[in-house]
């Protein structure tokens, strides 16, 4: 019983740590260090992104960490309550 709880706690910490880290992954068209191949985008698309960020509407760049962590905790609590019933 103790070992299974320890494994569950370790898995939960691993998931939360992965969500909270600022690790960079490679995506199509991106290179290490955040450099992007600009040939694949039109200049109008790039300028629109810059205009949106200058206007302060860059909320899509910020991850929603609180909601992810809250959902994980609520799911765990719901499972515990279901086990007790």
Swiss-Prot record:
Chief location: secreted
PANTHER family linked to this entry: GONADOLIBERIN (PTHR10522), PROGONADOLIBERIN (PTHR10522:SF8)
Positions of modified residues (Pyrrolidone carboxylic acid): 24
Family annotation (Pfam families): GnRH
InterPro entries: GnRH, Gonadoliberin
Any one GO molecular-function label of the UniProt entry: gonadotropin-releasing hormone receptor binding
Record's protein name: Progonadoliberin-2
Functional summary from the UniProt entry: Stimulates the secretion of gonadotropins.
Record-level GO cellular component terms: extracellular space
Modified residues (Glycine amide): 33
Organism expressing this protein natively: Dicentrarchus labrax (European seabass)
Subcellular location: Secreted
Similarity remark: Belongs to the GnRH family.
Signal peptide: 1-23
Keyword ATP-binding: no
UniProt key word Secreted: yes
Keyword annotations of the record: Amidation, Cleavage on pair of basic residues, Hormone, Pyrrolidone carboxylic acid, Secreted, Signal
């Amino acid at each position: 019983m103790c070992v299974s709880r320890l494994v569950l706690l370790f898995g939960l910490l691993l998931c939360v740590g992965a969500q909270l880290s600022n690790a960079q992954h490679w995506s199509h068209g991106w290179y290490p260090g955040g450099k992007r191949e600009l040939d694949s985008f039109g200049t109008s698309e790039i300028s629109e992104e810059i205009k949106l960020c200058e206007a302060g509407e860059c909320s899509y760049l910020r991850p929603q960490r609180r909601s992810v962590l809250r959902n994980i905790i609520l799911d765990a609590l719901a499972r515990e309550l279901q086990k007790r019933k």
